[in-house]
């Protein structure tokens, strides 16, 4: 079955029923470059909402461990390789992924 991470109550109910010790958040609204360009606000808002919902519900239900997988889109477009967390917010993001990238930054 699927769980809609945009619906806080659904997440809360899932956590109540399943009582996990660990939540791994790897979900994201994605769609490729064309979709990112055409719908940047959707990618920003829905990814932020999912992140807030799953973090908040996990905290409310006292989940012991939480792993948040993010994205290389969080890093400036001209970042040095290998990437390191201190590079986040140090330069311009890739414009075609900006909404998604900002959402991932805000929920990391």
Residue ranges of predicted features:
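NAD(P)H-binding glycine-rich loop region in Rossmannoid oxidoreductase-like domains
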Residues: 8-47, 57-60
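Conserved cofactor-binding/catalytic machinery of classical short-chain dehydrogenase/reductase
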Residues: 7, 22, 49-53, 65, ...
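Active-site helix of classical SDR
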Residues: 99, 103-106
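Rossmann-fold cofactor-recognition segment
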Residues: 1-9
């Amino acid at each position: 079955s699927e769980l809609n991470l945009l619906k806080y109550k659904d997440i809360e109910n899932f956590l109540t029923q399943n009582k996990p010790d660990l939540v791994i958040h790897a979900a994201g609204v994605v769609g490729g470059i064309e979709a990112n360009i055409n719908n940047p606000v959707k990618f920003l808002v829905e990814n932020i909402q999912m992140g807030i919902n799953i973090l908040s519900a996990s905290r409310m239900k006292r989940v012991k461990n939480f792993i948040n997988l993010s994205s290389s889109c969080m890093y400036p477009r001209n970042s040095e390789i290998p990437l390191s967390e201190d590079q986040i917010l140090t330069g311009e993001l890739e414009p075609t992924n900006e909404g998604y990238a900002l959402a991932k930054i805000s929920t990391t």
